[in-house]
């Protein structure tokens, strides 16, 4: 099977491999669920 080059399937989460809800901004490349788990370790602050 050929590697995907375009579309949502081409971008995968670095942590779990999911293709849904991937955050690409600033080169994060994590799905939103994984991002919520590791955001504080990455230096993001959580506000109310």
UniProtKB/Swiss-Prot annotation:
It comes from the Archaea. PROSITE patterns: RIBOSOMAL_S14. The keyword Zinc applies. One of its GO terms (biological process) is cytoplasmic translation. Zn(2+) binds at residues 13, 16, 31, 34. The keyword Transferase does not apply. One of its GO terms (molecular function) is structural constituent of ribosome. Disulfide bonds: none annotated. One of its GO terms (cellular component) is cytosolic small ribosomal subunit. Its cofactor is Zn(2+). Keywords: Metal-binding, Ribonucleoprotein, Ribosomal protein, RNA-binding, rRNA-binding, Zinc. Belongs to the universal ribosomal protein uS14 family. Zinc-binding uS14 subfamily. Binds 16S rRNA, required for the assembly of 30S particles. HAMAP family: Ribosomal_uS14_2_A. This is Small ribosomal subunit protein uS14. The lineage of its organism: Archaea, Methanobacteriati, Methanobacteriota, Methanomada group, Methanopyri.
């Amino acid at each position: 099977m050929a590697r995907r080059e375009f579309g949502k399937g081409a971008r995968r989460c670095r942590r779990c491999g999911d293709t849904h809800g991937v955050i690409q901004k600033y080169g994060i490349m994590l799905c939103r669920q994984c991002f919520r788990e590791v955001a504080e370790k990455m230096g993001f602050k959580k506000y109310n």
